[in-house]
Curated annotation (Swiss-Prot):
Higher taxonomy: Archaea, Methanobacteriati, Thermoplasmatota, Thermoplasmata, Thermoplasmatales
Protein name: Large ribosomal subunit protein uL29
CDD domains for the chain: Ribosomal_L29_HIP (cd00427)
Disulfide pairings: none
Residues annotated as transmembrane: none
GO CC annotation terms, alphabetical: ribonucleoprotein complex; ribosome
Matches recorded under InterPro entries: Ribosomal_uL29, Ribosomal_uL29_CS, Ribosomal_uL29_sf
UniProt-listed GO biological process terms: translation
Family named by the database record: Belongs to the universal ribosomal protein uL29 family.
Provenance organism: Thermoplasma volcanium (strain ATCC 51530 / DSM 4299 / JCM 9571 / NBRC 15438 / GSS1)
Length: 66
């Protein structure tokens, strides 16, 4: 998955951001499920990357609410 930057997120519509957030949360759930079943993630840094992207999306959402 492509790393999202704040500038790219701000250019998205609200619906696009919501859909991206939903997809990222599903990806995070999938990665955590793989690890919990005893498997190892193909890329260990992927969980961290997904969490940071979710945080960026939520930060931009909160900035726009103000």
């Amino acid at each position: 998955m492509l790393e999202l930057r704040a500038k790219q997120i701000r250019q998205m519509s609200k619906e696009e951001r919501q859909q991206t957030l939903k997809n990222l949360k599903e990806s995070l759930l999938h990665e955590r499920a793989l690890v919990s079943m005893g498997g190892s993630s193909p890329s260990p840094g992927k969980v961290r990357s997904i969490r940071r992207q979710i945080a960026r999306l939520l930060t931009v959402e909160r900035e726009e609410k103000k």
